[in-house]
Swiss-Prot record:
GO terms for biological process: UMP salvage; uracil salvage. It comes from Mesorhizobium japonicum (strain LMG 29417 / CECT 9101 / MAFF 303099) (Mesorhizobium loti (strain MAFF 303099)). Binds 1 Mg(2+) ion per subunit. The magnesium is bound as Mg-PRPP. Pfam families: UPRTase (PF14681). This is Uracil phosphoribosyltransferase.
């Protein structure tokens, strides 16, 4: 599917299977989400630009590769995005962080914004938006609309699961934003949940209903 990368690494798929199981505990779900975010983060940052810098090893001076330009921004779609955020910050501790508060109106399935906080220099940074589920895509589209409105031009979207309906809507709304996911599931149900899915990621992370 154009613009969509499915990360099919065996460890990603194994951990995702355990996360899908309804008997997986809240603690286990959180731990697995953090672990899988590290593996997904490796893929979403694969083609970051490098430059060279002169360093001293214990043996000699050398020209060594280092990330070029300003560091990343990880933009977490609250609240479930924070589960992916924690692992990504382990991978890139110097990254800046944006928080986008959105909730889904269960009647209309539309995204409603209640919070936004981001670095001021988004135009100068790669922004990786993280949200475990790309279901209806309403929240993802709204989040990226907001980021673009604040100057972001280089954006990627990282999720755990995606539905075909969500991918179609998202890529039409933001064809310039590549999507990285661990799985494209079968479809959405009448309530807008991904099937077979893993349930509500936020509820499973925090033990809420």
């Amino acid at each position: 599917m154009k613009g969509v990368t499915v990360v099919d690494h065996p460890l990603v798929q194994h951990k995702l299977t355990i996360m899908r199981k309804k008997e997986t505990s809240t603690a286990g779900f959180r731990r697995l989400l953090r672990e899988i975010s590290l593996l997904l983060g490796y893929e979403v940052t694969r083609n970051l630009e490098l430059t060279t810098t002169t360093i001293e090893t214990p043996i000699e001076t050398m020209e060594a590769p280092t990330l070029e330009g300003k560091k990343l921004v990880f933009a977490s779609v609250l609240r479930a995005g924070n589960g992916l955020l924690e692992g990504l910050l382990d991978l890139v501790p110097a990254a800046r962080v944006a928080h986008i508060g959105l909730y889904r109106d269960h009647e209309t399935l539309e995204a409603v914004e209640y919070f936004f906080k981001a670095p001021s220099d988004l135009a100068d940074r790669l922004v990786i938006v993280v949200d475990p589920m790309l279901a209806t895509a309403n929240s993802a589209i709204a989040a990226i609309d907001k980021l673009k409105g604040r100057g972001a031009t280089n954006i990627r979207f990282l999720c755990l699961l995606a539905a075909p309906e969500g991918i179609e809507r998202f890529t039409k709304a933001h064809p310039d934003v590549p999507v990285f996911t661990a799985s494209i599931d079968r479809q959405l149900n009448e309530k807008g949940y991904i099937m077979p899915g893993l349930g509500d990621a936020g509820d499973r992370m925090y033990g809420t209903k």
